C-alpha cells in the first residue's frame, strides 16, 4: 500500500489527521478543543449538537441525525476523546503531528485508540447525507471524556443523566481493537475490573531477629495463592485453542508497599492486584475465595477494593438478537470475517450495557498490528478509509432494523 501525495489526500484522512493533532492526552486533556472540533463538524454536516457537562470540565458532545420515525429507539455510536500519555523519545515522529509516511501510515497517539473510529462515524454519516439517505431510526454520536482513566467522569455519569435517557438508545457501537489477520474482532462482552489491595499486619521488630507472625510472611502466603490462581488460568488459556484471553480471568501483581528502613521489620505491608474477571465467573464465590486466601494466611490480613465492577452483561451474537443479525449480515455481504470475543480490558461499553442497551465493540482495522497505548501507534490510511466504507454500509442496516418490542 502506498500513500497519495498531500495534494491528493482524501478529505476524510485530512479530517482524521486534524483531530489527531488535538492534544487530548491524559492527565491534562484539551477537552475544550475537542468539543469545539465536534461543534464545527456538526455545523458543517447539518447535525444537531448538544453539550452535556457531566462533571466540571467534563463535557459529553452529542451529535444527532434525526430519523424518520421518532417512536423507534435510536442507534448510539460512542467514542472517547481522551488518549493515553506518550514517551516521545520512543517515537519515530511527534505523536501529535499526525505524520504520514510515504507508505501511508499515520503516526499519532489515538490513531488506533480510538480517534479513527470517531472520524469514521462522522465520515460515514457525511457520505450518507450527501447521497440523500434518511433512515427510520435516529443516529446519535457521543464523544465522551475520561475513558482512559476509567470513565468515572465520563460515560459512568452520563448514563445516569436524563440527557442520556432522552436519547432512547436501542443499540450501541463502541471501540474494538485491531486484528493482524484478515479477520475483524468484535466484542460482545467485557471482563470486569477488580482492583484489590491486600493489607497484612504483623509483629514489628529489629531485622536481625527471626520474628514470628510478621506482615511479610502472611502477605507472602496470599501472594502465592493469587499467583497460583493466575498460573492455573494461564494454563487453561494455553491448553485450549478455542479460548481467547477475554474468556479467562487474569490477574497481575501491580504494586508492593511497606517498610521504613532496611533494619526494621515492618508492622504493615500491602500488595495490589489488577484482576480482570471473566463474565461467566460466579462473582460472589470468587470474592469468597479471595477472602478465604486472606483468612488462611493468618490474623490481621484484610482486603479492600479500589474498583469492583459487578455488572457483567453479554450481548447475544446469534439471530435471536436483531441488532447482531443486521450487523453480521452486512459484514457477510462485504465478505468480512468476524471473530466475536470477550473484551479482555474495560471500555465505556460496560456502562452502556449495564443500563440495558445491547452493545458491540468494533474498530474496523484488520491486517493491522495491535498498537494501542504503544510507541509509534499508527494506522494505514487505506485501512482507515476501508473503515469508513464499512460504517457506510453498517449504519443504514442498523438504523433500518424494524420496530422491536423493546422500542415501546
UniProtKB/Swiss-Prot annotation:
<dbReference type="Pfam" id="PF01546">
    <property type="entry name" value="Peptidase_M20"/>
</dbReference>
<feature type="active site" description="Proton acceptor">
    <location>
        <position position="147"/>
    </location>
</feature>
<comment type="function">
    <text>Catalyzes the hydrolysis of N-acetylated amino acids to acetate and free amino acids.</text>
</comment>
<feature type="binding site">
    <location>
        <position position="113"/>
    </location>
    <ligand>
        <name>Zn(2+) 1</name>
    </ligand>
</feature>
<dbReference type="InterPro" id="IPR002933">
    <property type="entry name" value="Peptidase_M20"/>
</dbReference>
<dbReference type="InterPro" id="IPR036264">
    <property type="entry name" value="Bact_exopeptidase_dim_dom"/>
</dbReference>
<feature type="binding site">
    <location>
        <position position="80"/>
    </location>
    <ligand>
        <name>Zn(2+) 1</name>
    </ligand>
</feature>
<dbReference type="GO" id="GO:0070062">
    <property type="term" value="C:extracellular exosome"/>
</dbReference>
<keyword id="KW-0862">Zinc</keyword>
<feature type="binding site">
    <location>
        <position position="113"/>
    </location>
    <ligand>
        <name>Zn(2+) 2</name>
    </ligand>
</feature>
<dbReference type="InterPro" id="IPR010159">
    <property type="entry name" value="N-acyl_aa_amidohydrolase"/>
</dbReference>
<dbReference type="GO" id="GO:0005829">
    <property type="term" value="C:cytosol"/>
</dbReference>
<dbReference type="GO" id="GO:0042802">
    <property type="term" value="F:identical protein binding"/>
</dbReference>
<dbReference type="InterPro" id="IPR011650">
    <property type="entry name" value="Peptidase_M20_dimer"/>
</dbReference>
<feature type="binding site">
    <location>
        <position position="148"/>
    </location>
    <ligand>
        <name>Zn(2+) 2</name>
    </ligand>
</feature>
<dbReference type="Pfam" id="PF07687">
    <property type="entry name" value="M20_dimer"/>
</dbReference>
<comment type="similarity">
    <text>Belongs to the peptidase M20A family.</text>
</comment>
<feature type="active site">
    <location>
        <position position="82"/>
    </location>
</feature>
<comment type="subunit">
    <text>Homodimer. Interacts with SPHK1.</text>
</comment>
<feature type="binding site">
    <location>
        <position position="175"/>
    </location>
    <ligand>
        <name>Zn(2+) 1</name>
    </ligand>
</feature>
<keyword id="KW-0378">Hydrolase</keyword>
<keyword id="KW-0225">Disease variant</keyword>
<dbReference type="GO" id="GO:0004046">
    <property type="term" value="F:aminoacylase activity"/>
</dbReference>
<protein>
    <recommendedName>
        <fullName>Aminoacylase-1</fullName>
        <ecNumber>3.5.1.14</ecNumber>
    </recommendedName>
</protein>
<feature type="binding site">
    <location>
        <position position="373"/>
    </location>
    <ligand>
        <name>Zn(2+) 2</name>
    </ligand>
</feature>
<dbReference type="InterPro" id="IPR052083">
    <property type="entry name" value="Aminoacylase-1_M20A"/>
</dbReference>
<dbReference type="InterPro" id="IPR001261">
    <property type="entry name" value="ArgE/DapE_CS"/>
</dbReference>
<keyword id="KW-0963">Cytoplasm</keyword>
<keyword id="KW-0479">Metal-binding</keyword>
<dbReference type="GO" id="GO:0006520">
    <property type="term" value="P:amino acid metabolic process"/>
</dbReference>
<dbReference type="GO" id="GO:0046872">
    <property type="term" value="F:metal ion binding"/>
</dbReference>
Amino acid at each position: 500500500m502506498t500513500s497519495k501525495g498531500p495534494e491528493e489526500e482524501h478529505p476524510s484522512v485530512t479530517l482524521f489527521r486534524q483531530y489527531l493533532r488535538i492534544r487530548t492526552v491524559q492527565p491534562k486533556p484539551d477537552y475544550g478543543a475537542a468539543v469545539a472540533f465536534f461543534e464545527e463538524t456538526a455545523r458543517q454536516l447539518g447535525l444537531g449538537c448538544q453539550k452535556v457537562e457531566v462533571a466540571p470540565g467534563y463535557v459529553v458532545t452529542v451529535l444527532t441525525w434525526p430519523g424518520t420515525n421518532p417512536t423507534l429507539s435510536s442507534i448510539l455510536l460512542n467514542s472517547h476523546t481522551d488518549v493515553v500519555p506518550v514517551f516521545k523519545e520512543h517515537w519515530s515522529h511527534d505523536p501529535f503531528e499526525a505524520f504520514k509516511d510515504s507508505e501511508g501510515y499515520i503516526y499519532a497517539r489515538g490513531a488506533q485508540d480510538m480517534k479513527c473510529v470517531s472520524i469514521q462515524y462522522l465520515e460515514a454519516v457525511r457520505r450518507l447525507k450527501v447521497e440523500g439517505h434518511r433512515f427510520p431510526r435516529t443516529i446519535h454520536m457521543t464523544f465522551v471524556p475520561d475513558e482512559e482513566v476509567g470513565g468515572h467522569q465520563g460515560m459512568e455519569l452520563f448514563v445516569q443523566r436524563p440527557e442520556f435517557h432522552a436519547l432512547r438508545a436501542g443499540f450501541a457501537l463502541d471501540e474494538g481493537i485491531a486484528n493482524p489477520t484478515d479477520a475483524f474482532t468484535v466484542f460482545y462482552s467485557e471482563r470486569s475490573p477488580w482492583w484489590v489491595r491486600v493489607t497484612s499486619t504483623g509483629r514489628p521488630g529489629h531485622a536481625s531477629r527471626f520474628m514470628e507472625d510478621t506482615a511479610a510472611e502472611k502477605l507472602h502466603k496470599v501472594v502465592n495463592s493469587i499467583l497460583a490462581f493466575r498460573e492455573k488460568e494461564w494454563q487453561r488459556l494455553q491448553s485450549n485453542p478455542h479460548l481467547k484471553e477475554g474468556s479467562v480471568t487474569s490477574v497481575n501483581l501491580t504494586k508492593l508497599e511497606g517498610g521504613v528502613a532496611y533494619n526494621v521489620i515492618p508492622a504493615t505491608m500491602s500488595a495490589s492486584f489488577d484482576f480482570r474477571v471473566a463474565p461467566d465467573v460466579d462473582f460472589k464465590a470468587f470474592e469468597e475465595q479471595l477472602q478465604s486466601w486472606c483468612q488462611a494466611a493468618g490474623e490481621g490480613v484484610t482486603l479492600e477494593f479500589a474498583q469492583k465492577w459487578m455488572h457483567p452483561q453479554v450481548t447475544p451474537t446469534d439471530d435471536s438478537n436483531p441488532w447482531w443479525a443486521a450487523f453480521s449480515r452486512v459484514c457477510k455481504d462485504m465478505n468480512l470475517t468476524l471473530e466475536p470475543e470477550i473484551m479482555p480490558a474495560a471500555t465505556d461499553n460496560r456502562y452502556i450495557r449495564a443500563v440495558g442497551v445491547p452493545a458491540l465493540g468494533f474498530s474496523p482495522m484488520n491486517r493491522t498490528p495491535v498498537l494501542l497505548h504503544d510507541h509509534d501507534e499508527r494506522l494505514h490510511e487505506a485501512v482507515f478509509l476501508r473503515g469508513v466504507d464499512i460504517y457506510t454500509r453498517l449504519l443504514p442496516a442498523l438504523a433500518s432494523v424494524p420496530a422491536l418490542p423493546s422500542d415501546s
